[in-house]
Amino acid sequence: MSDPDLNHARHSLATLEHLVVQDIFMTETAWLADVVLPATAWPEKTGTVSNTDRMVQLGKQAIDPPGQAKADLWIIQQIAKGLGLHWNYQGEHHGVAEVYEEMRQAMHAAISGITWDRLQRESSVTYPCLSEEDPGAPTVFIDHFATDDGRVHLVPADIIPANERPDSDYPFVLITGRQLEHWHTGSMTRRATVLDAIEPTATASMCGADMQRLKVGLGDVITIASRRGHVTLRVRRDDGTPQGAVFVPFAYYEAAANLMTNAALDPFGKIPEFKYCAVAVHAGGELSLNAGFGVNA
């Protein structure tokens, strides 16, 4: 459901001969799997996470995993063993320290100074960090950029019209995204009692002027349709939404916004136009069953 081109994703998954999914929850994708490998959550395993803020963070196992859930590294090594590979990592937590040392050697230009022992002491270190005495670099490009003259090169961008613009049949622009209470597809947050109580159902946001023009009120059922798919959900007023646009979060499987997106590519950057497409909005429609993920599911 998180794939921004959901029609393509569903078609591709349906054509597979065998699908294996590793996850901590039975997600929409996991329900399609032939085999589900139950994984462990962050506090149930020891390992590192490297973020886009250039930080390597150590996480230590704090609690035992439930049921048959296993750590990622254990699962990977069992698959490798089944494929005839002779991996023999030694040490605690299935040899996670040895695996990290392999990563450090492969990424020596960035994290050579971040040893496993150092992470045990400091918990997290920012890279690039090239020696154990190096404190790390929270900010990069302070003195110069990686260009021939050391200066940043700014290039003015020309506005290119969208591939699919509103017309008489599809007069609105669809914007998809996240909302405060639910992360991505809600596989975790919709199981959180408090968060799910705040935002339990799928809604579309429109400004008051557009709602008045469509003759719909707060909480009314509307149907949003593009040339590729449609969803039915309730409408809420948000005057922060531009006139002529409708915002739909993609956290709800019962009203999957990514069924409607446009996969056309930008002619230069080849970036899909998933965040902009033309849609029609009509009052009424039949809501899909909202079963929720269930807190204990």
Q: What function would you assign to each model-found segment?
A:
Residues 1, 25-27, 41-44, 62-64, ...:
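Short, glycine-/Ser/Thr-/acidic-enriched flexible segments
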Residues 20, 35-37, 204:
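Hydrophobic/aromatic beta-strand patches that form the interior of the parallel beta-sheet core
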Residues 8, 16-18, 22-27, 61-81:
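Phosphate/diphosphate-binding loops
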Residues 66-122, 185, 189-205, 209-297:
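Long, contiguous, secondary-structure-rich segments that constitute the structural scaffold
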Residues 1-14, 55:
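Glycine-rich, anion-gripping cofactor-binding loops and their flanking helix/strand elements
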Residues 55, 155, 174-176, 224-231, ...:
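Flexible, low-hydrophobicity surface segments
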Residues 25-60:
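Flexible glycine/proline-rich, aromatic-decorated loop/lid segments
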Residues 96-194:
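Long, low-complexity segments enriched in small/aliphatic residues
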